[in-house]
A protein has these predicted regions:
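Flexible, glycine/threonine- and acidic-rich loop/arm segments that mediate assembly and lattice contacts
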Residues: 1-237, 241-315
Length: 315
């Protein structure tokens, strides 16, 4: 008598896990580190005050008359808000059927689109786009449009630092600790104190490789603790002559740049009522529709407080 097996039987239920595993990354180190502010217009502006240069000859005669120098005026900066959206349309049938891993499809899509929108903003902040006004879809100037400290390769040049133009690339070169130290010194001399180094995966690994030369000492692991041997191949905190840097990898940055950011002098502004706002769109046919919209701008309160190391060969 033949044995009845699953190969010949009919009616077995599928074994589909009631969990959805998401592999795509959603970490956004720059977006997460920036302060969050609310704005009331499509063009957000701010002022930066610099002190007069220190003088070693500030001495006068007894009874001397007062002399009045022209005060140092503030510098006025501004950046446009850009509108970033994600749209979702879910059929009535899909919402009604029994689904694995989620109950309501629209609610699930809202979560996904929110994560995707954060990733888009992260990538835009680290890009090289200049500010654009209403003659085109408005665009917020990226970090490279504000930074004038750090270094570029031979033949390259920094932006003017007001958001209206961007960095000009030069000759590629390898990442070195000296480039990082110089960038930190530039920002420190102008009153900044970068606390965050953001790099692509390639440059993050290259930075850790620099520790293999013996120039860096890692204290990530408590060597006195009674535990299994741990081999340290990464440097996550770097103590420079001009401050301590937390090293953060970003999946949304190019291999040609590294940012040294002072989070005290940069923020993400969103227009009031437009911060990841969910808008239900009128149904057309048998579908539920929604738009997730945020109107945001990068606000770099003190451009000289940061540095960029550009024209890296990323190898």
């Amino acid at each position: 008598m033949a044995t009845h097996t699953t190969q010949t039987a009919v009616g077995e239920r599928e074994d589909l896990a009631d969990v959805i595993y998401r592999i795509d990354p959603d970490e956004t180190p720059i977006f997460s580190a920036l302060k969050k502010e609310t704005s009331n217009g499509i063009f957000t502006e701010w002022q930066v005050q610099e002190l007069a240069s220190a003088s070693a000859t500030n001495y006068v005669n007894e009874g001397a008359n007062a002399t009045f120098a022209t005060p140092t005026a503030t510098a006025r900066f501004g950046n446009y808000h850009q509108i970033s959206v994600k749209d979702v349309a879910v059929s009535g049938t899909l919402e009604a059927v029994d689904k694995a891993g989620r109950d309501r499809e629209m609610a699930y899509q809202r979560v996904l689109k929110s994560l995707e929108l954060r990733r888009d903003i992260e990538k835009s902040i680290g890009d090289t786009d200049v500010a654009r006004d209403a003659s085109d879809p408005r665009k917020s100037a990226s970090l490279t449009c504000w930074m004038t400290n750090g270094s570029v390769g031979a033949g390259g040049s920094f932006a003017t630092g007001d958001g209206t133009d961007t960095i000009t690339g030069g000759t590629d070169r390898a990442l070195t600790l000296a480039l990082i130290e110089d960038g930190m010194q530039d920002a420190w001399e102008d009153g900044g104190s970068p606390k965050m180094l953001v790099a692509s995966a390639t440059n993050r690994a290259n930075f850790s490789d620099l520790s293999a030369t013996g120039n860096l000492v890692s204290n990530d692991v408590n060597m006195t603790a009674a535990k299994a041997t741990t081999y340290v191949g990464s440097t996550s905190v770097y103590l420079t002559d001009f401050g301590t840097l937390d090293v953060a990898p970003s999946r949304f940055m190019g291999n040609d740049r590294i940012f040294l950011i002072d989070p005290d002098f940069a923020s993400l502004c969103t227009l009031q009522g437009r911060n990841f706002a969910e808008k239900d769109i009128a149904a057309t046919g048998d579908a539920e529709k929604m738009q997730l919209v945020t109107e945001w701008s990068l606000k770099v309160q003190a451009p000289k407080a940061h540095s960029v190391i550009y024209d890296l060969n990323g190898s």
